[in-house]
């Protein structure tokens, strides 16, 4: 059973601003719209996969 503090730590988010190619951003937005995803969800999943493949 998780404590309230552990649960809150899991939900903490940080702002992460980046510069991205406009075409790539458009493709990502279209993909998210078609797949009912938020941009944050898609980006987090992509980064997790990227790091997992590289033992990061």
Swiss-Prot record:
For this chain's UniProt record, which GO biological process terms are given? regulation of DNA-templated transcription
Pfam hit, one: 56B_RHH
Source species = Sulfolobus islandicus rod-shaped virus 1 (SIRV-1)
Q: What is this protein called?
A: Uncharacterized protein 56B
Phylogenetic lineage: Viruses, Adnaviria, Zilligvirae, Taleaviricota, Tokiviricetes
């Amino acid at each position: 059973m998780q404590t309230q503090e552990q649960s809150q730590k899991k939900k903490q988010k940080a702002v992460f601003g980046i510069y991205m190619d406009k075409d790539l951003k458009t493709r990502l937005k279209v993909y998210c719209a078609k797949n009912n995803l938020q941009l944050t969800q898609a980006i987090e999943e992509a980064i997790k996969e990227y790091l997992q493949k590289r033992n990061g």
